[in-house]
């Protein structure tokens, strides 16, 4: 099921011209996940309407999360994942694009296609609908869950939210 954890300044990397060299030092069993990120310009409301969620986003960017697992052979429960900060290791964010510059973005996101390559060989592919039917609905889910959990602070303007992997997580070296 869906889970979330914190991304820290020290684990957030902005790719320059969509390129980044990232150290895997200190990460345990790292894997790569292609994702979509949003930067919030204001606090999104509790809604399942993708257009309303998008109105509160400043920009969108493709991203790569490097996840890690402290459990042998990635064998764990959901509770283990949550205790391991949702497996977060690094978040590499590509070039941000202002959401208003992409016509029909909310409707197009479920159909967004991504291919994951390793040494010029495609090892996986996915679509935006793989994350709760749309990256925007994934963001809406997070808003809803945080609102229902009074001990969790709500999302804030300026925060960057990654919406979940579009493919399986694959080992990276």
Feature-to-residue mapping (PLM):
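Short, structured beta-strand/loop micro-motifs enriched in basic residues and often containing a Trp
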Residues: 139-146, 159-163
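Catalytic-core "active-site belt" of small-molecule-metabolizing enzymes
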Residues: 1-134, 143, 148
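Conserved metal-binding segment of the jelly-roll/cupin
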Residues: 155-173
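Phosphate-handling active-site elements
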Residues: 150-153
């Amino acid at each position: 099921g869906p889970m979330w954890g914190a991304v820290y300044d020290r684990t957030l990397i902005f790719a320059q011209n969509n390129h980044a060299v990232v150290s895997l030092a200190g990460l345990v069993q790292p894997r790569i996940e292609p994702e979509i990120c949003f930067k919030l310009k204001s606090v999104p409301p509790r809604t399942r309407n993708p257009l309303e969620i998008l109105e509160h986003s400043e920009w969108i960017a493709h991203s790569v999360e490097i996840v890690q697992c402290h459990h042998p052979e990635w064998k764990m429960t959901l509770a283990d994942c949550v205790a391991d900060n949702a497996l977060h290791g690094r978040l590499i964010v590509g070039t941000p694009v202002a959401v208003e510059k992409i016509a029909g973005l909310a409707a197009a996101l479920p159909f967004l296609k991504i291919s994951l390559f390793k040494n010029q060989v495609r090892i996986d592919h996915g679509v935006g609908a793989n994350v709760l039917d749309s990256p925007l609905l994934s963001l809406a889910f997070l808003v809803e869950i945080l609102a229902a959990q009074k001990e969790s602070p709500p999302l804030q303007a300026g925060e960057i939210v990654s919406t979940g992997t579009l493919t399986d997580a694959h080992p990276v070296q």
